[in-house]
Swiss-Prot record:
Gene Ontology CC annotations of this record: endoplasmic reticulum membrane
One Pfam family matching this protein: p450
Cofactor requirements of the protein: heme
Chief location of this protein within or outside the cell: endoplasmic reticulum
TM segment ranges: 3-23
Gene: CYP76B74
Keyword list, A-Z: Endoplasmic reticulum, Heme, Iron, Membrane, Metal-binding, Monooxygenase, Oxidoreductase, Transmembrane, Transmembrane helix
Enzyme class name: oxidoreductase
The protein's name: Geranylhydroquinone 3''-hydroxylase CYP76B74
Membrane topology according to the record: Single-pass membrane protein
GO molecular function: heme binding; iron ion binding; monooxygenase activity; oxidoreductase activity, acting on paired donors, with incorporation or reduction of molecular oxygen
CDD domains assigned to the protein according to its UniProt record, in alphabetical order: CYP76-like (cd11073)
Catalytic activity: (2E)-geranylhydroquinone + reduced [NADPH--hemoprotein reductase] + O2 = (2Z)-3''-hydroxygeranylhydroquinone + oxidized [NADPH--hemoprotein reductase] + H2O + H(+)
Provenance organism: Arnebia euchroma
PANTHER family found in the cross-reference section: CYTOCHROME P450, FAMILY 76, SUBFAMILY C, POLYPEPTIDE 5-RELATED (PTHR47950), GERANIOL 8-HYDROXYLASE-LIKE (PTHR47950:SF4)
Amino acid sequence: MEYTTILVGFLIGFVLFKALTRKSKNLPPGPHVLPIIGNLHLVGSIPHKSILKLAEKYGPIMSLQFGQIPTIVVSSPSMAKEILQKQDVAFAGKRIPDALNAHNHWQFSVVWLPANSLWRTLRKILTSNIFTNNRLEASQHLRSQKVRDLVEYCKKSGDKGEAVEIGQAAYRTSLNLLSSTIFSKDLADYYSETGAPREFKDAIWNILVESVKPNLADFVPILSMFDLQGIKRRAGIHFGKGLKIMEGLVNERLEHRETHGATHNDILDIFLNYCDEHPDELDRHRVKHTILDLFIAGTDTTSSVTEWTMAELIQNPQVMKRAKDELAQVIGKGKCLEESDVARLPYLRCIMKEALRKHPPGPFLFPRRPEEDVEVAGYTIPKGAQVLVSIYALGRDPNSWEDPLAFKPERFLDSELDFRGNNFEMLPFGAGRRSCPGLPMAVRMVPLLLGSLINSFDWVLDGGMKPEDLSMEEKVGLTAQLAHPLKIVPIPVKEE
């Protein structure tokens, strides 16, 4: 980012428009606020780490100022419960990143919409028609096939002694799982990418990149009209490409339905059927945005969890061995898992929980926004403030977790703690009415994928690197990822 541009932008915002937020004498504690920039100078290149250090000083509910935006950071289970459960309705609003104004995308997004009639319609379709146990049971063969495709790709790489970039491989697997579930076709190829599949994959990735870039307009909203950094313009280009591909796939399906009827019974058919039955609630334009939303939210998350977990297993060989021993005993060496196997693999489930605790896909839940002043823990959260729940901090709270920086899956063996939104010590998928609707699919896909990779291969770092030399540095996108992609060589294990 051009720091000169940032400075000029803030000066323009400060000179032309005084801060719109009124001061509150009863804000939670926080650091001294500088003119114009507020506390932005305290947020480093890895914001969730910098903010965790500030929270250790100022407490579990903390006040920051990001440009013109008052920001409240919550970093303890009790405070998270207050925001997400006890006063969920008061904090149901969202603060919209300026990049999502491109093509008015947020106005059709189940993630970003306020709790209005369209949001309730989309949420109902997702939770009652798509991510139900019955439908997920019926589609488990798809997930198994996509995992087998990944294992086959890894075997071919291993036979040639080539390393696999595990995050990218998992990303393609997630992309194909979603596209098969939604459209009944694959949109990614492990071996070559050309034409529409490559264009769509790049569009999704670039939307993610632009959406999370530090944006002047998010700190000084009046600057949105100038788009000084060009973020909204570039986001618009990538949204346009993604929506154009969506439109082509929808039109292709409509032509098929005219001739053959609704024969696929996939997610696209569910949406189109709903459009036909409830045209006053949903139309095809909204469907395109909603499906694009599923790809944006669903692909990066699974790949991030997979990469972090494999990195931790490489660095903790005793955990890898225990996982392999359990898998060998329950299903036999070298075999891919089926979803029905996961219930008999408690240590594998603990590995997933521990990875989600230590490396949640998103370090913060999407920012909440109260529409009125709200009292929390004796403090006043002002109307229009940005409220951030730090999932990263919850998972590393020494009051909740013994030795929180260590990777110890066994901590969950005798624990009832889970990640489905009922235990506020770890909330990787959120809680309450705005929790992730795709959670039921994630809890099926991630252990299936991880277990198959662990059981089908032995893994060594590329180039003879030792596990203790593996970098665990982070970079920040929509999800927190390894700064240096994990490249590991698969050594196929013979089936027994």
